[in-house]
Amino acid sequence: MARDEDLGALFARVTRRLIEAERPLLAARGLSMWAYVALTRLVEGPAPTQIALAEQMGYDKTRLIAILDRLADEGLVERTPDPEDRRARIVQLTAAGRARHLQARSDIRTMESEMLDGLSDTEQAMLREMLGRLASAAG
């Protein structure tokens, strides 16, 4: 057991394992990790602009354009001109994007359940709650 291990080291080990497990699940759905993150943010509602979406994701705005281009080409997102700023684009999830995200999230939740099999349902819920609070506090 790693009771004395620093939180950063513990998070790094778990994060690495989660990413290794998620990557093939997302690839099977035709998504990269960052494309999935973008869809996840858009499930919460349309992004006021592409720049705002990049900020919400903590991702480089210039690199996000290529991801959004691909998602738009696949019909998963729509970008429309911002009526208040012709240079800006509003990003919205399409029904196909919502469905693809739901499929990917279901795959990930199944994997997470298997990974957390050693924890009770209550412990799993507590872990998710605490991690959510930590993530919110971190920004």
Language-model features: where?
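Charged, amphipathic alpha-helical coiled-coil/dimerization segments
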Residues: I19, A47, I51, D69-G132
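Conserved alpha-helix in the HATPase_c
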Residues: A66
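N-terminal leader segment of winged-helix/HTH proteins
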Residues: M1-R29, D117
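Hydrophobic structural patches
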Residues: F11, L39-L42, L131
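Short, charged, intrinsically disordered terminal tails
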Residues: S136-G139
